[in-house]
Amino acid sequence: MGAILGQNYYSVVNGYEWTTARSNAQNLGGDLVVINDVTENNFLLDNFRSEVVISNFDGAGDRGGAWIGLHQVRTNTDRAWVDGTTISYTNYGPDQDKASVPWDGGYLLLMKADGSNQNTWWIEPQDPLTTYSINANQWAYRYGIAEVPLSYYSISDLTLSEGDTSSITISRTGGTNSTQNILLTSSDGTASAGSDYTAVSQTISFAAGETSKTFNFAAFTDSVTESDETLTITISGSGSDDIPAQFTDNSSLITIQNSADTTSPTFSSAATNTAGTKVILTYNEALSATTAA
């Protein structure tokens, strides 16, 4: 299970190698986590310790850790985060801040062998000619922690006349590198599904990089003179996406304006009749009678 802090979603990914863990994090639409302060560091400990710690590993007690987005280019002793930012907050373990050690792929140690809490960063020394892999039996490097910017969705309102078809727009802001499915569901107001419009129940998929989608809405026509009618279309997350969708405006108010002919009829006589002679009028629209007082 993942967790949200601020505008980012965090989750555990697999990866015995730092590069594999990073690739899996990027496949979610983010990267390995960049830790900016002690609040974020402790947030990771609180939420993911139980997922990565191996109980009584090889009889040596509870141990576990996860790759984070800390790395060092081998031709440059400057360490940096995977997003290119410099390191402003650090929480290295003993002797882990030595820039002379050839390495790539920092990890966050989440628990000591004796089961006590641990919140320090450690590095994995490597020969410069090797990949950043480790033995599959190693306890500390089975996972990585991904950090993915959240996507925020909103849906536009719509006003249209009876008999018309128009488009409604769903917009996406924030992180757009993940694939997500958005559910659309209509609910009656004064307008009724079946008689005023076709009920809406569908899924719209956003591919990585897409920021908006439109879908068409059609209002039925009738000959009844009535007030404007309304309904609501709500958007929600599918519940099955790797990254949960967030919403800034999840409700669209649809107003269907009456289009029935409300013009008062006019009459003109085609003939002149003698007073008192009956005249027959033929009218091809429904009439409503009003009883005179």
Model region roles, listed by residue range:
Residues S151-S264, N273-I280:
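Short boundary segments that mark the start of a structured unit
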